[in-house]
Amino acid sequence: MSPSTGVELYLDLLKRTVSNFIYQDATHVAGLITEAAFVEEARESGEDYPTVAHTMIGMKRLNNLQHCVESALRDGVPGDVLETGVWRGGACIFARGILKAYDVRDRTVWVADSFQGFPKITDDDHPMDAEMNLHQYNEAVDLPTSLATVQRNFSRYGLLDDQVRFLPGWFKDTMPTAPFERLAVLRMDGDSYGATMDVLTHAYPRLSPGGFAIIDDYCIPACREAVHEYRDRHGISDEIVEIDRQGVYWRRSA
């Protein structure tokens, strides 16, 4: 059924805009992608590297983010929204738009990123991260996006205000002292074992019961390893639900 209310129409259009289903920009050529073209199925599933769009997570994961935020609001789950790994900011822009659409004034969207792309590999990194060496993809898919650029993107949507706060830096440095108290939605998009584990270790304990943990890169073995290692260590048995071929989420029961 098509959207009908003003809120539904706004959020549907906002999703289409941050993912650029409107003007349908081509993808970067990288990895398994050999042609610079817009492919609707790939954009729907977040399986391309947009040249212009403000998010690469695709429509299915945007729908999931909307489901999680709206469910938290409906059920009165206390806390803010945090995304770790934001690229051009599109998913966080959409999250702020959801709060705006429902006139929610007591929650914050936290935008955490290095704003430098992936870090260089060091001797301290997990072996699976060293093998992937994600740093090599920074330029190929235009990953490094400055804080100023992300802030400007928020401003273009009319959504840069005091309910948006930025946490620039590597997660191992920013997460231990991040100033949020409670989270209703925790969206992790760091790709690597290290980034995922840093966020789970320091942010997941602040996720409220009934809140949502979203893992954008569960399809990546290093990320999946961190997720299961953390869940096993802390006895987390909440059902992992598949979003698409890449992402999953679960709802925290306790």
Swiss-Prot record:
Swiss-Prot/TrEMBL catalytic activity: mycinamicin III + S-adenosyl-L-methionine = mycinamicin IV + S-adenosyl-L-homocysteine + H(+)
Classification via Pfam families: TylF
EC primary class: transferase
Gene Ontology process terms (BP): antibiotic biosynthetic process; methylation
Binding sites annotated in the UniProt record for Mg(2+): 189, 216-217
Keyword rRNA-binding belongs to the record: no
GO molecular function: magnesium ion binding; O-methyltransferase activity; small molecule binding
Protein's UniProt keywords contain Chloroplast: no
Record-listed S-adenosyl-L-methionine binding positions: 55-56, 83-87, 113-117, 171, 189-190
Disrupted gene: phenotype observed: No production of mycinamicin II and accumulation of mycinamicin III.
Alphabetical keyword list: Antibiotic biosynthesis, Magnesium, Metal-binding, Methyltransferase, S-adenosyl-L-methionine, Transferase
Annotated EC: 2.1.1.237
Family per record: Belongs to the methyltransferase TylF/MycF family.
Record InterPro entries: SAM-dependent_MTases_sf, TylF_MeTrfase
Biological function: O-methyltransferase that catalyzes the conversion of mycinamicin III to mycinamicin IV in the biosynthesis of mycinamicin, a 16-membered macrolide antibiotic.
Cofactor(s) this protein requires: Mg(2+)
Biological classification of the source: Bacteria, Bacillati, Actinomycetota, Actinomycetes, Micromonosporales
Pathway stated in the Swiss-Prot or TrEMBL entry: Antibiotic biosynthesis; mycinamicin biosynthesis
Gene assigned in the entry: mycF
The protein's name in its UniProt record: Mycinamicin III 3''-O-methyltransferase
PANTHER family: MACROCIN O-METHYLTRANSFERASE (PTHR40036:SF1)
